[in-house]
Amino acid sequence: MEEHPPFRRLILEDDRIVENENFDLGIAVALEGDRLATAVIVEANTKNWPEFVKTYNETVDATRGGRVDAMNAPVVITSLGAFGVKAGAPIVVPPSVGTLFVGTAHRELIPNGKKNESAEVITLSLTFDHRVVNGAGAASFANKIKKQIEGFRIPAAKTDAIRT
């Protein structure tokens, strides 16, 4: 989002568009009774990995416990992966300008020269508000996310520190 300014913007109730240097990240959280709330990680871009994970866990737990945050997240991440859903078409709820759906991890055959190889994959679906971002900008943003996920590694020491 730091490299893609349109995804740091918010659409205010009066339809003004504002851009923030630091940005919040929304996480859709399923609640009892088929309800949904958004956990908000405030200034997500300023946190290192251990801080982000700690804040994520605390924020999601608080949201499940009934806390409602002011929703100022330009992008909300949602997933039905826990239910085995591979793909979805989320909607964008203002003030957000984008919603990223992350599907469940599953195996697919990937062509590799003369043979196919099995690989674990996920499906990403990005829905965005055309008043703020165009298709080419959204494609560039989605491609950046894809590349970051493909290259993502958590050092064992950091993972162990987060668990304790």
Each PLM stretch: what is its role?
Residues 2-164:
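C-terminal catalytic/motor cores of large multi-domain enzyme assemblies
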